[in-house]
A protein has these predicted regions:
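Hydrophobic alpha-helical membrane segments
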Residues: 1-217
């Protein structure tokens, strides 16, 4: 597996389906950014990071599950309707949110110990979302199967994921410095929404990896 080919194919898919992905995910991404802004206003700049995590757990499972279902349908040649995908995503939300909460806590704990354990868990759990959504398994089963599917594939997944995540992290950091809290709220909402939408790119890349590595023969 060549990471450059995976990235090329993923960018191509994202580009040709950009309008459909925008219509499907952007409204929820904007709602998430607005919710983060409201939480920050209520709790102040020194609010616990858990408030931010809670907002993410409310919205992230919805637009990510919808995107995964969209990716699967388009790969099979179908043109899925957005409301149908969102309906399925809403049905999956309780299980997805539970799994996302467990994964987030594990990765945060790993990062707290040292960076490498958190990074290891992030890679080993990278297919869990796709397993839960596409194979309709329980959160713990999805996490366990993700560990199994990534055996012997840690480094290819790591290199591919870092190749897309590092530029996005840099962009997020630079935009945070350029558009500080002194900027008007609409500007911050716009920047946060754009950054959050671009974070969907790793979902597309990991889906491509899952198609290559994780789907049954």
């Amino acid at each position: 597996m060549n990471p450059l080919i995976v990235l090329r194919d993923s960018f191509y898919f994202f580009r040709i389906n950009l309008w459909a992905i925008l219509r499907l995910c952007l409204p929820l991404v904007v709602c998430e950014a607005l919710a983060r802004e409201l939480v920050a206003r209520v709790n102040g700049p020194d609010a616990s990071v858990m408030y931010d995590v809670a907002v993410g757990l409310l919205f992230y499972p919805l637009y990510t599950a919808a995107l995964i279902l969209f990716l699967d349908a388009r790969t099979d040649g179908y043109e899925p309707q957005g409301r149908h995908l969102l309906g399925k995503a809403l049905h999956l939300w309780p299980r997805f949110a539970l799994m996302a909460a467990i994964s987030t806590l594990l990765i945060m704990f790993g990062m707290w110990l040292f960076v490498l354990p958190g990074l290891y868990l992030m890679i080993k759990l990278s297919f869990a979302e796709y397993l839960l959504v596409l194979r309709n398994v329980t959160p713990l089963q999805a996490m366990r199967e993700s560990f199994d599917l990534t055996k012997g594939k840690f480094w290819p997944i790591l290199f591919t994921l870092l190749a897309i995540m590092i530029p996005l992290w840099l962009l997020d950091g630079l935009s945070a410095m350029a558009w500080a809290d002194t900027q008007p709220t609409p500007v911050r909402l716009l920047v946060d929404s754009v950054n959050s939408f671009l974070q969907l790119l790793p979902t597309v890349v990991l889906f491509r990896l899952f198609m290559l590595m994780g789907k049954p023969d």
